[in-house]
Every structure is written in C-alpha cells, then in structure tokens.
Amino acid sequence: MFHGPDKPWAGEALINTLNSLLSKARSAGAPVFLARHVGPPGSPIEPGSPLTQLVQELLLQGDEVIFEKSRPNAFAMTDLVDRLKACGSQGVVIAGMKTQYCVDSTCRAARDLGFDAVLIADGHTCTDTLALKAENIIAHHNATLAGPFCRVVHAEHWHF
C-alpha cells in the first residue's frame, strides 16, 4: 500500500523513522513483528499482491517475524497474542499505516488485550481523504489515542 496509487503523507520520513526503530529494537534485543495486510482473492490487496509486500526500503535482517493479517486489528484472527506471550512481551510498539484503520484498531485492541501499547507519534501515516488531509488525520489520532488507549511517544524519545 505504501507504493500504491495514493502516496502516503511524509512517506520518506516514515521509512527513516521505521528503520531507526528497527535498529533500536535490535540493539535492545526486542523481538520485531511486522504485519502485512491482505484482502480477499481478486482484491487489489489479495495475498501475493505487490501492494501487500513490505517495502524494500525497510532495513530488514531476516530475524523479524512477518505475518499476514486480514483485519485492521493486527491481533484479530492471527496468532500475534500467542507469539508475544511466548517471548515474554508485555507491551507493543505500534507504527505503520494506515493511521485511521490498522494503526488505530491495533492500538485499541492491544490495550484491551492487556498489553502496554505505545504508538510512535511520527511512526505512522496515511493518505489524504476527501474529508481530511493526512497530516490532520495523524494529529487527530495521536491526540485521541493518547491516554485511554496507548502512550504516544516520538521515535527519538522511545527506548526499548
């Protein structure tokens, strides 16, 4: 979706932020889980579609756990909870796209499932909609989710 027809807001900055987070996680020995959103066969995001692939700009090293999800919430219909518990994780750091769908849903679900949820304020993005510019969607979600659903922290201030 990152390289789809609608370009995400501040996409290059997001890639830099995500790569910084990956580096920090590795240095701290934190497990890294990456979700790929897939849709039904025949849809633009059917399994195997180029739109569902992780972007090549991410500096992956092969030690990441990459899983597919078919719902906005990364926990729904996946084994993410079991995998997190198996490695002793009590919290999750959430970043990616799209802000108003997958990022929002995953933040809310993480807290409901008992995880300490951290949303990286400058670590998620989306595209403009007919109603709002992407920058405003991101700011709104950072403000709305902070507190009841997660902690919102800028990447430069986050330490694993």
Describe the predicted segments one by one.
Residues 14-15, 37:
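N-terminal short leaders/motifs
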Residues 16, 20-28, 45-160:
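Active-site-adjacent betaalpha module
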Residues 25-43:
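PIN/NYN-family metal-dependent endoribonuclease catalytic core
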Residues 1-4:
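Metal-dependent nucleic-acid phosphoesterase active-site entry motif
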Residues 6-12, 44:
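Short glycine-enriched, charge-decorated loop/helix-capping segments at active-site entrances
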